[in-house]
Curated annotation (Swiss-Prot):
InterPro entries: EFTu-like_2, EFTU-type, Hint_dom_C, Hint_dom_N, Hint_dom_sf, Homing_endonucl, INTEIN, Intein_C. GTP binds at residues 464-468, 518-521. Keywords: Autocatalytic cleavage, Endonuclease, GTP-binding, Hydrolase, Initiation factor, Intron homing, Nuclease, Nucleotide-binding, Protein biosynthesis, Protein splicing. Pfam families: GTP_EFTU, GTP_EFTU_D2, GTP_EFTU_D4, IF-2, Intein_splicing, LAGLIDADG_3. CDD domains: aeIF5B_II, Hint, IF2_aeIF5B_IV, IF2_eIF5B. GO terms for biological process: intein-mediated protein splicing; intron homing. SMART domains: HintC (SM00305), HintN (SM00306). The intein interrupts the GTP-binding site. Residues 391-608 form the tr-type G domain. Residues 94-215 form the DOD-type homing endonuclease domain. This is Probable translation initiation factor IF-2. One of its GO terms (molecular function) is translation initiation factor activity.
Length: 984
């Protein structure tokens, strides 16, 4: 039986850079030290994009941020941005800490999730990292110290601390042991141990300097204070006092200190406790527990509830225990004697033991790595000028000692905020969201009536690819998994590198798409009415706002034309098969979302009907979006099923790194409608079957080696299993390659990304030796090293959306193996090609400096042009063919050497080269006119075999016709003695 499935819609967009900071905000980079964002931008030389409003530069340096597990660590900062801004900025002052000024959209990690600066309130708590990373390379610092005339020893740094006689910026480039000596000197000289804290006069960057040791201090006007058990112990361990009285006072202070920082994360602890079977009464958590209390609570939660079995029995109705019934009712699990939705979900979690230490570890990491301080003041200011931003691999970084984040269209459709739901909110993977047709009708109802549209689809399945790189993972039988795509473009910023990359990928996969021109709300004077269709909202605007919108739309239309697309505003499109439809929207306020949904549904229905017809009962086929470990389930795969029906207990064949994996579905977990497949806990329904098109999490044994981007095929019979294995291995082997031929080594995060990178390289004629999925390893570097010995231009590694393992980084640096990593394919290849060109030019310059060019000269027959007969002989000559340079040896017609050209002169000027047709005077060392050389005689430049090979093999493009003639003439002379020259 065939039916129409819901279309799969991929949402692509460029990195959002409406979230920026003032130019004077500071960041710490181990390689550079403490710099302002403006200084960082100026240090980055390679321009990626530049226009009137913005400039993007490639950075590629390490910067402190927070990873997806909640750990403070060094992250790769890919780009630094500068954007023109006119309007409101938000200055956030943190109590006892620094302030930072950002655009209103810039989010902060708070005790209530990621919150935009414009929505922050006094009393909110925002995250401060417990440490920042500086330089630990002593050899590197020694060079810097030498340039600055500083001795790089602890004694000098201790004395500098006592007198503050050193540039403070140097301290962020100095290794920890020297910084420790500096701080010890400063605290010995100026520090006072009070009853509850250490106190010292404040200098500007002292709190950031202390963060290098995990010490969080407090700023009070012109004083800095260190208090709390954890901070005091870290101070004693890493800094301490040389002064014995102060050291003793510190020991006493620590012995009395019982508490460290307090953490306002009550709701997160309650959620975690409930997951492990604890009610709030059992845990009895105070409002803001201290670090010490929190650690005890987490240990208790990790051990699990001792009476979980009784609670399960109560929820299942097997026992009736009044006390438990009352408590579970208070927790919202039971209402009017029946299980609530939360109760049903939690019962499944408890029954299946879907929790383990990893859930606790995330919160523990947050507590170990971050401190939450209260917002003292939120101030709105007007600003005109450039604002700056940095793109890191997890889209967050530390500025002014505060964690800031860059983070959307699907959120508006879902009417949820995924980032706020995630405790860390720092993931950038593909997610899938099912939007039922009822929701589409609810959002776009008035428009559907107005347009007399009828939507027959069961719904829309959106796949959120936060970057174009994720789209390449959406593979289905060599094409794209997506039926349709939405390309999100900031109408104010226009095309970005990611936009261009996305267009190229959509073109390559032949995926039809519509354009969402986002952020119309930022057009000056735009009147906002939330969730209003664009066509109605546009009627509220004055002529100036409409004119600005039209100008920006025409700029976009012009850009699309450059890429070979006819485009127009959606309501002006005459033929949707020939023109791109652009829908002006505001994802933030929901304006235009109605038109976008109706357009997607209408186009899918009209033009993709045949593609959407599927055999419902047939075996399922799908594509892996992500492989991840889930508490209680082990390794799972997030899959988009695009054909057939998948059942619990079905045998499936999955693409693995080295082989096809055959396993049995143990559980199918389906996100609720409008929920996203990577949402946190309480999101999944356990189902017995799932029919295309749908996003589903599959739990099954042996999925550790499953490859993101590879196929999933249900195989009901042994014959079908073998057939599926063959098909999957064919697909993988067509992408993952390992050969002995000359070529570059490429790595990518998924099979689809690898395929896209391979295709681009092949189209450019760049050979590939090895293509594989995964991070760049030591083995990859060693292989590139062996290639380099044969052909240096291919002895490189190109990595797309992957990391470089530490040991690989060290060897590559030591051996000089170039590694190119990034998340824009065309930019990666451009970087590689630019490097090859630079290396070739460098090699050419080296060869040109060494090689001898061929030349033929004739001495003037007139004795008047003999200016000196010997020591050296100076004569007037004409260059007949080729060229001559000082240092070349001259030979006669019979091959006899006559001397070396010492210098070349034209009138009063000495020349480094003379070419065909030039008349010059040459000084010939070792020749006597009348004995060795004679007026009117022809002489030839003596070149070696190696010179001839170098010229013809490596420098052919710089040889002029005259050089080649000279080479042939000289070859004829030399061929009398050496047959090698006959071939020239």
């Amino acid at each position: 039986m065939k039916k129409i499935r819901q279309p799969i819609i991929a949402v692509l967009g460029h990195v959002d850079h409406g979230k920026c900071l003032l130019p004077e905000e500071k960041v710490v980079l181990p390689e550079i030290g403490l710099v302002t964002l403006r200084e960082l931008f100026e240090l980055a030389n390679e321009v990626v994009v530049k226009d009137e409003e913005k400039e993007v530069r490639k950075l590629g340096k390490m910067l402190t941020g927070v990873d997806e597990r909640g750990n403070v660590k060094l992250l790769n900062a890919l780009y630094v941005w500068r954007v023109a801004h006119k309007g409101e900025m938000i200055r956030v002052k943190v109590n006892g800490w620094y302030s930072v000024t950002v655009t209103p959209e810039h989010p902060f990690l708070t005790n209530r999730g990621w919150v935009k600066a414009g929505e922050l309130k006094e009393g909110d708590y925002i995250a401060i990292p417990r440490r920042v990373y500086g330089n630990e390379d002593l050899m590197k610092f020694s060079k810097i110290a030498k340039e600055l005339g500083i001795k790089g020893d602890e004694k000098e740094f201790y004395l500098a601390g006592a007198s503050l006689d050193i540039p403070i910026k140097v301290l962020f480039l100095a290794p920890s042991k020297l910084v420790s000596a500096f701080l010890r000197g400063y605290f010995d000289a100026k520090g006072v141990v009070r009853e509850n804290y250490i106190e010292v006069p404040l200098f500007e960057d002292l709190p950031l300097l202390l963060l290098r040791f995990g010490i969080v201090s407090r700023i009070e006007k012109s004083t800095l204070k260190i208090s709390g058990k954890r901070n005091l112990e870290l101070f004693r361990k890493h800094v301490g006092f040389t002064d014995s009285e102060k050291a003793k006072a510190l020991d006493e202070l620590i012995s009395k200190a019982k508490e460290s920082e307090r953490y306002p994360i009550l709701e997160e602890l309650r959620r975690l406790g409930l997951l492990f079977g604890f009610t709030r009464n059992e845990l009895r958590i105070e409002e803001n527990p201290t670090y010490e209390v929190l650690m005890e609570i987490l240990e208790r939660i990790e051990r699990g509830s001792p009476n979980l079995a009784e609670k399960i029995a109560v929820l299942e109705g097997r026992i009736k225990e009044e006390n438990y019934l009352r408590i579970l009712e208070e927790e919202g699990l039971i209402e009017n004697g029946k299980l609530t939705e939360l109760g049903k979900e939690l019962l499944e979690v408890w029954r299946n033991r879907e929790f383990d230490s990893k859930d606790v570890d995330y919160v523990r990491n947050i507590v170990e790595n971050l401190v939450f301080l209260p917002v003292e003041k939120v101030e709105r200011i007007e600003y005109e000028g450039y604002v700056y931003d940095v793109t890191t691999e997890t889209h967050n970084f530390v500025a002014n000692g505060i964690l800031v984040h860059n983070t959307t269209l699907l959120d508006r459709i879902r009417k949820t905020n995924v980032a706020a739901k995630e405790a860390g909110g720092i993931t950038q993977h593909i997610g899938a969201t099912e939007v039922p047709i009822d929701v589409v009708k609810e959002i776009a109802g008035p428009l559907i009536k107005l347009w007399k549209a009828e939507i027959k689809l069961p719904g829309l399945l959106f796949i959120d690819t936060p970057g174009h790189e994720a789209f390449t993972s959406l593979r289905a039988r060599g094409g794209s998994l997506a039926d349709l795509a939405v390309l999100v473009v900031d109408i104010n910023e226009g095309f970005q590198p990611q936009t261009i990359e996305s267009i190229e990928i959509l073109r390559r996969y032949k995926t039809p798409f519509v354009v969402a021109a986002n952020k119309i709300d930022r057009i000056k004077g735009w009147v906002i009415q939330e969730d209003e269709p664009f066509l109605l909202n546009s009627k509220r605007q004055d002529q100036r706002a409409i004119q600005e919108l039209e100008t920006k739309l025409w700029e976009l239309i012009g850009k699309f034309y450059e890429f070979g697309f006819q485009a127009n505003r959606f309501d002006r499109v005459q033929n949707f098969t020939r023109e791109l439809a652009i829908v002006p929207i505001s994802a933030k306020y929901g304006i235009g979302i109605a038109e976008l949904l109706v357009l997607i549904a209408g186009l899918s229905q009209k033009y993709l009907e045949e593609r959407l017809k599927i055999e419902v009962e047939g075996p399922a086929r799908g594509t892996i979006l992500e492989v991840r470990e889930e508490p209680g389930l082990g390794h799972t795969i997030d899959v988009i099923i695009y054909e057939g029906t998948l059942h619990k207990d079905d045998t499936i064949v999955v693409g693995g790194k080295d082989k096809a994996i055959v396993t049995k579905v143990r559980a199918l977990l389906k996100p609720k409608p409008l929920d996203e497949i990577r949402d946190p806990r309480f999101r999944f329904d356990y189902v017995d079957e799932v029919t295309a098109a749908a996003g589903v999490k599959i739990a099954a044994p042996g999925l550790e080696e499953a490859l993101a981007g590879s196929p999933v095929i249900a195989a009901p019979t042994p014959e079908a299993v073998e057939k599926a294995k063959e098909e999957i291995m064919r697909q993988i082997q067509s992408v993952v390659i390992s050969t002995d031929k000359m070529g570059v080594i490429i790595k990518a995060d998924t099979l689809g990304s690898l395929e896209a990178l391979s295709k681009e390289l092949q189209e450019k004629g760049i050979p590939i030796r090895k293509a594989d999925v995964g991070n760049i390893s030591k083995t990859d570097v060693m292989e590139a090293l062996s290639v380099r010995e044969e052909d240096p231009k291919y002895g490189v590694i190109i990595g797309f959306n992957v990391k470089v393992n530490e040991d690989a980084q060290e060897i590559a640096k030591a051996k000089g193996v170039p590694i190119f990593v990034g998340n824009i394919i065309y930019k990666l290849i451009e970087d590689y090609e630019a490097w090859v060109k630079e290396e070739e030019e460098k090699k050419k310059r080296e060869l040109l400096a060494k090689v001898t060019f061929p030349g033929v000269i004739r001495l003037y027959p007139d004795e008047r042009y003999v200016f000196r007969r010997s020591n050296p002989a100076i004569v007037g000559i004409e260059v007949i063919e080729g060229r001559i340079k000082p240092g070349v040896t001259l030979i006669k017609q019979n091959g006899q050497k006559v001397g070396t050209i010492k210098s070349i002169k034209s009138r009063d000027e000495f020349l480094q080269e003379a070419k065909k047709g030039q008349a010059v005077a040459v000084a010939i060392e070792g020749a006597i006119v009348g004995r060795h050389i004679h007026p009117g005689e022809t002489l030839y430049v003596d070149i070696s075999r190696d010179d001839a090979i170098t010229l013809l093999k490596y420098l052919r493009d710089v040889l002029e016709d005259s050089d080649i003639k000279a080479l042939k003439i000289i070859a004829q002379i030399k061929a009398k003695e050496d047959p090698f020259w006959r071939a020239i």
